[in-house]
Amino acid sequence: MRKIVVRVVLAIIVAILLAWTWYATQLPRQRPATDIKIEASAENIERGRYLAVNVLQCVDCHSERDWGLYGGPPVEPIGAGRACMTRKTIAAGVNAGQENFPGRLCIRNITPDEETGLGSWSDGEIIRAVREGVNKDGKGLFPIMPYFIYKHVADDDMQAVVAYLRSMQPVKSVRPERQIDFPMNMLVQLWPEPFDSPAMAPDHSDSVARGRYLATVAR
């Protein structure tokens, strides 16, 4: 009987070690960022501005908001990040109801600042983060960043968004690293999925299909 117990315990230990090795070495699922270099044309930047501000809501989420005004418009400096959410946060606006957050999450600076923003990221790394939920360092993003929605953004539109982000005024704005509680910290690594097929926008002349597409990718 004792031998059976020992074998069972050893089997459990081995299974745990194998599971941990798989988790530590294989997650999050990811592919290398593409080496794409996006054209910073005026047309691309303007298209990206429309999408980032009005559809994907990048600017609203990554800027402080004035909740004393209707709709809580973003305030300067635009795109420089927001205060952290923690268990003690008194959430307001779009974050209402997110008290007791499982750890600490700080909305990042997405301006092209080299040290604290996206300035040191490649275009491909930004696209991979937005669509696939994996950051520059290969870690899974917390799904408050809706990459599971943005994976449907067409390639041309995604490139336009990056062109706009590159055109923003760089702001030096440090945000603390996240600290996510167990088991959420492990789940965050499970959710990202590689995305390697082209995404196409519908024909602009088909207003119904175009509207459906925008409604699908809208935040």
Short names for language-model regions:
Residues G48, V55-R65, I126, V161, ...:
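The canonical Cys-X-X-Cys-His
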Residues V53-L56, L105-I107, G140-F142, V217:
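Extracytoplasmic
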